[in-house]
Amino acid sequence: MGAAVTLNRINIASGIADIRDKYMELGFNYPKYNRTVKFAEESYMYYYETSPGEIKPKFCLIDGMSIDHCSSFIVPEFAKQYVLIHGEPCSSFKFRPGTLIYYQNEVTPEYIKDLKHATDYIASGQRCHFIKKDYLLGDSDSVAKCCSKTNTKHCPKIFNNNYKTEHCDDFMTGFCRNDPGNPNCLEWLRVKRKPAMSTYSDICSKHMDARYCSEFIRIIRPDYFTFGDTALYVFCNDHKGNRNCWCANYPKSNSGDKYLGPRVCWLHECTDESRDRKWLYYNQDVQRTRCKYVGCTINVNSLALKNSQAELTSNCTRTTSTVGDIHPGEPVVKDKIKLPTWLGAAITLVVISVIFYFISIYSRPKIKTNDINVRRR
């Protein structure tokens, strides 16, 4: 039977390129669980910028810590030119508060979150982040120029990072409602930020026949298909007479009872005319990939009737290959990391031991004894 996973050693090694960086080597009795966690302990006094207009000390400010810890790493004369903003999420060791754990290799935010008892030793926080006062955008015109990429020459990085952060979401929501086909709006959508997908879901629920809605459906499937299904449902519910909607919202009719299989495989609006997947719900899109289309033609040059009977034979199954759609993909489901547990193994060991004990008792040979006759007078 296996033994429990135990921590045998912890070694702290200093970095070579940067003395602030350190490596915590965790050694277990099973080598496959060994990990090296890189972290930083800030010790510099900043009088320079880590990037244009920004200073980001290697310090994780966890709950309960004063923000004065962040300003303690900047020289007073230099600090007057900067202001502290909401930094990126980070993790820190509770027994060494302020340390900044690097996310790399197997060590990710999801890995730390899913670790059993991780919150007993690791705390979440915000990294110290300063921006030069001259880089703060104090008016809507400056935000518009940066987020719409009209003029990004003097834009801070948080407003000029290809929409990777939330800083342009408010502006882009209003901007893209007025111009949803704008290339910058489609770039914002391709990042798959929730505000962008929600905005286009609302837009396409009124204008699903627009070209940009085809791109919208392509981007959100398969992981965020509900945004597209909602838009299609609302649009087709408001436009029941639109033939493009007849696959998703087919008019009530008894003709469907004459065919076998889902209508997405045989209905004219689902196959021949409506090749754009935006007119299908996601489950219909998946279903259509399982439909096999066979095209057959019969050319008659002359026709001779005998006894009023005519036979037409189509040789479609010999030379014609079936054609189907490409599968749109499956949504990604992230499973939680399962750490090894020995509770089940321990219970099994106890049960087996008890069984063997009773077997050994009852399998021993009987001890011979003399019969004793007892008679009562």
UniProtKB/Swiss-Prot annotation:
InterPro entries: Pox_virus_G9/A16 (IPR004251). Induction: Expressed in the late phase of the viral replicative cycle. GO terms for molecular function: ATP binding; DNA binding; helicase activity; hydrolase activity. Coiled coil: none annotated. Pfam families: Pox_G9-A16 (PF03003). It is found in: Virion membrane. Disulfide bonds: none annotated. Residues 363-377 are intravirion. Envelope protein part of the entry-fusion complex responsible for the virus membrane fusion with host cell membrane during virus entry. Also plays a role in cell-cell fusion (syncytium formation). Belongs to the orthopoxvirus OPG143 family. This is Virion membrane protein OPG143. The gene is OPG143.
